[in-house]
Amino acid sequence: MAAPSDPPTAATPPAPPPPARRCLLAPSVEPLLFLATLALGLQVPLATQYLWDRLGAERGYVGPNASSPHGCGNGSGAVDPLREEVEALVAHWNLCINLGGFFVGLFSVTLFGPWSDSVGRRPVLVLPAVGMAVQAAVYLLVMYLRLHVAYLLLGRIISGLLGDYNLILAGCFASVADSSNQRTRTFRVAILEACLGVAGMVASVGGGQWRKAEGYINPFWLVLAASLAAALYAALCLQETVKQRRAAKLLTLQHYKAVYKLYTAPEDLSSRRKLALYSLAFFLLVTVHFGTKDLYVLYELGSPLCWASDLIGYGSAASYLAYLSSLGGLRLLQLCLEDTWVAEIGLISNIAGLVVISLATTTPLMFTGYGIMFLSMAATPVIRAKLSKLVGETEQGALFASVACVEGLCSLVATGVFNSLYPSTLHFMRGFPFLFGAILLLIPAAIMGWIEIQDSNLQYSHFSDASSSPADG
């Protein structure tokens, strides 16, 4: 009898909520990561070249710079002391800027990452994108107003306080872990890593040419625009992936304790041991990636390769293509192999390619090394996915915050170790750092193989016990 009193139009009021949606589509974090990586990929080399030109001009140095199109420009002529002074100053400021950003970011990433497990991923993706935009704006002010280069450090610290690029990495990978299941997670992570490669390729190929044509100002406006676009996408279009959000204090030591407990909590000793071993494997693998990538251009510029800028560009594009070929190879190999063995094949590809590059004396042999490394990026998404599967749903933010900090540490260690090793070994083998990297990669290969064999033996023993127990009964 109450039914007639309900008007037929009573179902229409719930309609207003859809227009309240902030965006027509809220698909995934891939566009956000692409934009942020594009901004970073443009900014880092441009900032280094700007420091070179600015500091060189202040000291009256007018010789060739790091972006000159000459191959073997450092032939057998006398060493220019003024050039050495400029190189030392650029290295000094680069080190200060990178260290300042790393140490500030170390505390902010491990604060915001666990916080996102409670309040959601969107806030911790908006903040670092805004920080990167502020950093780009500060860099533009330095260029327009010819401010002291120390202001570049200020921009980097501001970005670090808001989490910097490492927090974007942590938030994106945690978001993928939230929205994927155990079976599909590895491939979803690989898609994210492919975005890193595509964005890096676009920045590498386009940024240098644009700088040569129009200077520094216009490319840095694109850095600012890409960072702002990433922030707007995260704020307005990105779908929240944390299912059960709750209010949580930001400024508390509990967030740092959450990261610490990942590796020390005694509930599941086996999982925590695997977490530490996989983290070590990830550290070594990414350190080799960063360290060798830093040396490719130096190696190609020197004798006997003597590459000009066009060949260097092709080589850079070939190294980034490994992200895409690894994605396709991972997908195909997953049809017949466990993820660990796919990663082992990727490590073998990486090791073989580095050995060939270490011995390369001709252009075809150098490109052969790049070609052999077509599966070299298959191991990192597997390790990230393995780490993600070892922790609970409410620990993904804390986990990927710690992984992002490890990645930042890898960059510093790689720069220190490989850039020191290269000049020290020139007198007996120019390619020794690549051979050293190949040897280091044997350690993560051994770690992953050992864990997989141990797990297989454990599963086999459980299966044997289960099959023999009915007979005993």
From Swiss-Prot:
Location(s), subcellular: Cell membrane; Apical cell membrane; Basolateral cell membrane; Endosome membrane
List GO BP terms, alphabetically.
folate import across plasma membrane; transmembrane transport
Effect in UniProt of substituting residue 193 to A: Abolished proton-coupled folate transport
* Chain segments carrying region Disordered: 1-21
What cellular component terms from Gene Ontology apply here?
Answer: apical plasma membrane; basolateral plasma membrane; endosome; endosome membrane; plasma membrane
**Residue positions binding H(+):** 164, 193, 289
Residue stretches of biased makeup (Pro residues):
1-20
Give the primary localization class: membrane
Under InterPro entries, the record lists: MFS, MFS_trans_sf
> Where in the body, by tissue, does this protein show up?
Widely expressed, including brain, aorta, liver, kidney, spleen, small intestine, pancreas, ovary and testis.
Variation of activity with pH:
Optimum pH is 5.0-5.5.
Give the Gene Ontology MF terms in alphabetical order.
Answer: folic acid binding; folic acid:proton symporter activity; methotrexate transmembrane transporter activity; transmembrane transporter activity
Disulfide bridge partners, by residue number: 72-306
Q: Where does pemetrexed bind?
A: 98, 193, 323, 407, 411
User: Domain of life of the organism in this record?
Assistant: Eukaryota
Catalyzed chemical reaction(s): folate(in) + H(+)(in) = folate(out) + H(+)(out); (6S)-5-methyl-5,6,7,8-tetrahydrofolate(in) + H(+)(in) = (6S)-5-methyl-5,6,7,8-tetrahydrofolate(out) + H(+)(out); methotrexate(in) + H(+)(in) = methotrexate(out) + H(+)(out); pemetrexed(in) + H(+)(in) = pemetrexed(out) + H(+)(out)
Q: Which residues lie on this side of the membrane: Extracellular?
A: 49-90, 144-148, 212-216, 298-310, 360-363, 423-430
Transmembrane portions of the chain: 30-48, 91-116, 121-143, 149-162, 186-211, 217-235, 275-297, 311-333, 340-359, 364-384, 397-422, 431-449
Q: Which sequence ranges are listed under topological domain Cytoplasmic?
A: 1-29, 117-120, 163-185, 236-274, 334-339, 385-396, 450-473
How does the entry describe its membrane topology? Multi-pass membrane protein
UniProt keywords (A-Z) are: Cell membrane, Cytoplasm, Disulfide bond, Endosome, Folate-binding, Glycoprotein, Membrane, Symport, Transmembrane, Transmembrane helix, Transport
- Subunit structure comment from the entry: Monomer.
Similarity-based family? Belongs to the major facilitator superfamily. SLC46A family.
Q: What does this protein do?
A: Proton-coupled folate symporter that mediates folate absorption using an H(+) gradient as a driving force. Involved in the intestinal absorption of folates at the brush-border membrane of the proximal jejunum, and the transport from blood to cerebrospinal fluid across the choroid plexus. Functions at acidic pH via alternate outward- and inward-open conformation states. Protonation of residues in the outward open state primes the protein for transport.
Name of the protein this chain belongs to: Proton-coupled folate transporter
**Organism from which the protein derives:** Gallus gallus (Chicken)
Which classification does the entry list for the species? Eukaryota, Metazoa, Chordata, Craniata, Vertebrata
Question: Could you tell me the gene encoding this protein?
Answer: SLC46A1
